[in-house]
Amino acid sequence: MTLTENHQDKQAESIIGQGSRLCISGLNAAATATVRQVIMELGAVATSFRPGADGIILPDNASGADRAEALAQGFVVFTVSELTRLARGAEEQRSAIEVGDKTLRILDIEIPRGSEKTASDSGRFKHLCLDRLFLTTARKAALAVRHGIPCMLEGETATAKTTAILWLAMLAGQNAVRVNLSGHTDTGELVGRFIPSTQTGENRPAWEFSEGYIPRALRNGWWVILDEVNLAEPQVLERLNPVLELPPTLVLTEHDGRRFGSGGGVPVSENFRLFGTMNPSEYAGRATLSPAFRDRWGIWGHIGKPSEPELLDMLRCLVTGESPAFVWEGVRWIPPRTEPVYPVLSNFPDLEVTLKSIASFHARISGAAGDNEAPASIGRVRRERYVFTRRTLLNAMRLIHENSNGASRLRGVAARVLAEIYIQRLADPADRAAALALLRATGLA
């Protein structure tokens, strides 16, 4: 009996695309690789372990006893064909991005395009993989733009939170201003302060008021990105509460009391938007946001770390320029092809196996460094844990590319670069030995 013929059908479809963990059982290596790709397209996570899994993937020729055993354990059961049917059975197939003269569409969200010549250089985005994780993040920002609601993106470092907003601004033709907050940020930087006068002449004043980023953005219709929000002091953030209201307002009590917005003398541009990014509060030095401040961010997105298959897709995209298609909300989305960054690497016969090993090593050492969900197995005596991010991986790929000239195989080059970028940054010899063991486990060392 197939999945569509039994009582599990609706239950099976309900767990797809919501971060479910699907255990692959009884498949050979080639079939496992194919199924992992399908699982990722569906927005789920592939695992080889049954504990903690939501569903089990069995071979098409699995026995009735195997299926019955999995059902008895409370799992939703798929065969390979059934899983593929769900992935390919989306009612609609659409391009993930559509750039028109007057509008921009990211997945299902359409926003107007402006005509600003932005400071964002499209070349800075050449390393992007337009996968499910990145595009759903950009969609969250586009949703905020469409409805004029302040948007906060929270996630681990180097998960492309700020990049997604800047990329969206570039495509939308909007001027975006990025403000890096810290414990030293004061209200003068954001709202304004008096500075020595720049005027000339005998009667020039000694001081003049210089508006901060927020008043200028309100007037000119800029998008403002407040980076690392929870590094700033609470009293600095609370000064922004009126700007986070709908509609935004601001009274310059620091100067002449002029009012931006409703009932004031300075109108707020309809293009003004406010974004924030932050790492989880468990990070060192991060403040806990007040309930009043947090509540004013009407759209809040939690951005996860890329999984090992997503890391592999990113590496492939750097070489081929192709981002993976994925199923989201019942639609199969097709990202556009981009210019490959390192196309010369495609000439190596061991490219695919090397990229898989690189992605596997990064995922393993990142996990060993620990996160908010799991303790560290390396760097345990340090006050701050080691961090290996997407940025680390991009640096490694750049060095692999630059050192590949004249090499006959890529694996040796990759092993040397990974040792240099990842292992040599570890201070403790025991940690370096543990990291080297992880590298050997991927077959690279």
Provide a role label for each language-model segment:
Residues 1-11, 80-96:
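Defense-system signaling and execution modules centered on TIR/cGAS-STING-like, death/scaffold domains
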Residues 2, 89-445:
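C-terminal regulatory/interaction module of P-loop NTP-utilizing enzymes
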Residues 8-12, 57, 63, 69, ...:
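Low-complexity, compositionally biased segments
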Residues 9-85:
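Interaction modules related to DNA damage response and DNA replication/repair
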